[in-house]
Regions:
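Bacterial N-terminal signal peptides that target proteins for export
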Residues: 2-13
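Hydrophobic helical h-region of N-terminal Sec-dependent signal peptides
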Residues: 14-18
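C-terminal motif of bacterial Sec signal peptides marking the signal peptidase cleavage site
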Residues: 20-24
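Bacterial signal peptide processing site
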Residues: 26-29
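Extracellular mucin-like PTS domains
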Residues: 35-67
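Core segments of small alpha/beta cavity-forming domains
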Residues: 74-158
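Structured, amphipathic secondary-structure segments that form assembly/contact surfaces
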Residues: 119-242
Length: 242
């Protein structure tokens, strides 16, 4: 039996809070400030394991990906697989992997938008399109913390956090509270998070040294209605392999 367990996970906004703390230490990017909070998401992810609570489906599953205009800034879209992922088949696996990578790409885009001061699309209704239910309260707390920190920090950041070497490190089957399960419904996506282009309001690099890049892992959960959602991020280590 294989079980996923993500301890000491950080939402994207926790990374912003950490960055704000680092940049506020008299210009010392290696300051000792810590994120205001972290979220912990534990998920049993095998066909025979018990599951933590998830939201019940509110709409019927749709195998087709939503057709929407390319989102920008803090805009949030629902992410579904482009093919039916209910079957245990190669095409379903590839569709789930692609959906999980889209979740991570959206997470990175939202992180940059929030760092730039764009909080337009942060209502509960909009966040629910993207955030795993157990992670919602933490994301909301971190958004408010980021609002406060940006105000106290003298303005928003410029530049973007970038991603590279994106790959799926685990693909598991999640058993839902009603006893049903879907293959490829719990995924972990690992990548290199690069902060080297991010600048503070005064134009200085926000993070320098070994902490300017980090290897992180994002948990992605498929809900019963077919949506793939962000369920938390954990930092594996400072620096990246490449």
């Amino acid at each position: 039996m294989k079980t996923t367990k993500h301890c000491n996970t950080l939402t994207a906004l926790s990374a912003v809070t950490l960055l704000l703390g680092l940049s506020a230490c008299a210009g010392d990017a290696q300051g000792s400030s810590q994120p205001s909070a972290s979220s912990t998401t534990s998920a049993s992810a095998s066909a025979s394991s018990s599951a933590s609570p998830v939201a019940s489906a509110t709409s019927s599953a749709s195998p087709a990906a939503s057709v929407v205009a390319e989102p920008k800034g803090s805009e949030i879209i629902e992410i579904r697989a482009a093919d039916d992922t209910n079957a245990d088949a190669a095409i379903a696996k590839e569709a789930a992997i692609a959906a999980a990578k889209r979740v991570v790409a959206q997470d990175n885009r939202l992180l940059n938008a929030w760092m730039h001061g764009d909080f337009e699309h942060t209502s509960d209704e909009e966040l629910a399109k993207y955030v795993y239910p157990d992670t919602m309260s933490q994301v909301k707390e971190d958004i408010q913390s980021a609002r406060n920190d940006l105000k106290n920090n003298g303005g928003s950041f410029t530049g973007n956090v970038t991603m590279r070497d994106v790959g799926v490190s685990d693909i598991l089957t999640y058993k839902y509270p009603d006893g049903s399960s879907h293959p490829y419904s719990a995924l972990r996506v690992k990548y290199c998070m690069d902060w080297t282009q991010v600048r503070t309001p005064d134009g200085e690099r926000a993070v320098t040294g070994p902490d300017s890049t980090a290897t992180v892992e994002v948990s992605v959960m498929r809900l019963q209605d077919g949506r793939y959602t962000y369920a938390g991020t954990r930092q594996i280590n400072s620096g990246c392999a490449s």
